[in-house]
A protein has these predicted regions:
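Helix-loop-helix
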Residues: 61-76, 82, 145-219, 223-224
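Pre-NBD coupling/linker segments of ABC/ABC-like ATPases
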Residues: 228-242
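ABC-type nucleotide-binding domain
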Residues: 240-441
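Post-Walker A connector loop of ABC transporter nucleotide-binding domains
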Residues: 59, 63, 165, 169, ...
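An intracellular "coupling" helix at the cytosolic face of ABC transporter transmembrane type-1 domains
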Residues: 12-18, 32-45, 49, 53, ...
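Helix-loop junctions at the membrane-solvent interface of multi-pass transporters
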Residues: 63-64, 87-90
């Protein structure tokens, strides 16, 4: 349930929220940290619930036998508890550091796998291995350091236990000589004291696991503390509420976190229904950023982005994004069939709608020739398709259901001139009422 709740929360975050935590760190928290918390809770339920009853019961029985000898227990227990507290105080920050270094290793792994062709093209495998080795060495160093501190706990606890038992036998013998205690009572007292101290040792071992779980729980809590910038219970889009204009930018400025300067500075424009807006600019000029403000992937720094007469971030995000077909720069396809990828925007899209979208995107010609047509399997990331094929399927997916707004973010870079021209003409003729934003270099 924790993992599911965390996953739902992550999906409710804006791009800026995800950027703040980091994709690799989120994956690590969703997998490793939730497992660590789960193990800690399991250990707590099995041992921590039982141990207090053993300690309390044995302590009561020991006091009933001999109050003076029980003082030894009340000296030993705080000693062990104090060491447990000191170890927790020291190791929790160290466990957090270890997890952060695991995040770094996960980031390097992800980047290496995604950029393996570039790395090999520049013969940088050795450099990447060196960086990964350094990250792993950091994990090893911090793990050894925290392990050394945690290892103090068991020897100290057993030393206190043995000294306590020795003290009981010593002073118990004196009391037996004095006639105030019997041998049987002393034996019973030693057994009770052993139960108490062993229960404390079990708790001490549990603390090591629980300390890891506590550090992981804090990391998970950090993700939950990132508030969604868009309310999931906002208003629904009323496409009949305003015919013209459909999109308005009103003195919009935007800056990425820690970027230093604005990516977009005081931009204003209006797009009416059925119009096509072309945006051309150099690398880093803010074209893609501008496009991502329309579906409210990011919030503006100042000004308003208005769709159908209302600020986009006041809408329910699902309702807003159902009116928008968005094609990012990088074509993203998911494992499954062509049909399943095409139904991503509209779950109940019929084959007729899918084929119509594929034809508009100039993709039906090659999809129809695939081994199983719409049921052809797509490997992870579409690795069994060419760049142009992936782009055309990505474009077709955004066209399913005839969205009111279509955003093409430099999404035809892998297409030849003739195919690109045919695509633009098909969109204009097949979707005359759709407002189109085309971004290009």
């Amino acid at each position: 349930e924790l993992r599911t709740a965390l996953y739902k929360h992550i999906n409710s975050l804006s791009y800026s929220g995800i950027d703040r935590v980091g994709t690799s760190s989120i994956v690590n928290r969703l997998t490793n940290d939730t497992n660590t918390v789960q193990n800690g809770v399991n250990m707590f339920i099995r041992l921590a619930v039982r141990a207090p009853f053993l300690v309390i019961g044995a302590a009561v029985m020991a006091v009933m036998i001999d109050v003076k000898l029980s003082i030894i227990f009340f000296i030993a227990a705080p000693l062990i508890s104090g060491v447990i507290f000191l170890i927790m105080h020291k190791t929790i920050p160290m466990y957090k550091t270890t997890q952060k270094r695991l995040d770094r290793a996960a980031l390097l792994t992800r980047e290496n796998l995604e950029g393996t062709r570039v790395i090999r093209a520049f013969s940088r495998q050795g450099n990447e291995i060196k960086k990964f080795d350094e990250a792993v060495d950091g994990i090893t160093t911090s793990s050894i350091a925290v392990g050394k501190i945690s290892a103090i706990l068991n020897p100290f606890a057993f030393m206190v236990m043995n000294l306590g038992i020795a003290a009981i036998i010593w002073f118990g013998g004196i009391r037996i000589d004095a006639g105030s205690l019997t041998q049987g009572e002393l034996t019973a007292f030693v057994n009770y004291m052993t139960q108490i101290l062993l229960a404390l040792i079990v708790l001490a071992n549990l603390i090591v696991t629980f300390t890891k779980a506590f550090a992981s729980a804090n990391r998970i809590s950090e993700v939950f503390d990132v508030e969604p910038e868009v309310e999931s219970k906002g208003e629904n889009v009323d496409t009949a509420a305003s015919e013209r204009p459909i999109i308005e930018f009103k003195n919009v400025s935007f800056a990425y976190e820690n970027a230093g300067e604005d990516s977009i500075d005081n931009i204003s424009f209006t797009i009416n229904k059925g119009e096509t807006l072309g945006i051309i600019g150099g690398t880093g000029s803010g074209k893609s950023t501008l496009a991502m403000l329309i579906p409210c992937f990011y919030r503006t720094k100042s000004g308003e982005v208005v769709v159908y007469g209302k600020d986009v971030c006041k809408y329910d995000p699902d309702s807003l994004r159902r009116t928008i077909g968005y094609v990012p720069q990088k074509s993203v396809l998911f494992s499954g069939t062509v049909r399943e990828n095409m139904q991503l925007r509209k779950k109940d899209a019929s084959d007729e709608e899918i084929i119509a979208a594929l034809k508009t995107a100039q993709a039906w010609e090659f999809v129809s020739k695939l081994t199983n047509g719409l049921d052809t399997a797509i490997s992870q990331g579409g690795k069994n398709l060419s760049g142009g094929q992936k782009q055309r399927i990505s474009i077709a997916r955004a066209l399913v259901g005839n969205p009111d707004i279509l955003i093409l973010d430099d999404s035809s870079s892998a297409l030849d001139y003739a195919t690109d021209l045919a695509l633009r003409r098909a969109i204009a003729s097949d979707m005359p009422d759709t407002t189109v934003i085309m971004i290009s270099q």
